[in-house]
């Protein structure tokens, strides 16, 4: 079992450094299928696209993601439509990735694996 599933996101108000690239790659191994992307501001994100059979399945999934995000106090950027949902996760307060991002990614994946 992924040890990230037993952790809870902790509030981040800044003041800590984002993960460096070696930490990012270490944690990336714990979340299957999540890509590391860098936006135009050079901020790292976790990214994953999920595919579904129709709009309703996408919507149900996104609602579950919303519930988990509220419970964890950590909120991804979400876009979805007919048959897909795209999720980007970063820790905005530190403009980069932290353990919280990987915890949330692991918990989101559990929705699909249940």
Q: What positions do the PLM features span?
A:
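Long, contiguous binding/interaction regions
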Residues: 1-56, 60-114
């Amino acid at each position: 079992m992924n040890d990230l599933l037993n952790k809870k996101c902790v509030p981040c108000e800044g003041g800590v450094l984002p993960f460096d690239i070696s930490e990012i790659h270490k944690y990336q191994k714990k979340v299957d299928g999540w890509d590391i992307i860098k936006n135009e501001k050079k901020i790292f994100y976790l990214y994953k696209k999920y595919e579904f059979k129709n709009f309703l399945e996408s919507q149900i999934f996104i609602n579950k993601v919303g519930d988990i995000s509220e419970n964890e106090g950590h909120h991804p950027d979400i876009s979805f439509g007919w048959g897909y949902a795209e999720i980007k996760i970063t820790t905005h307060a530190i403009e980069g990735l932290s353990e919280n991002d990987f915890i949330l990614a692991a918990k989101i994946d559990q929705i699909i694996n249940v």
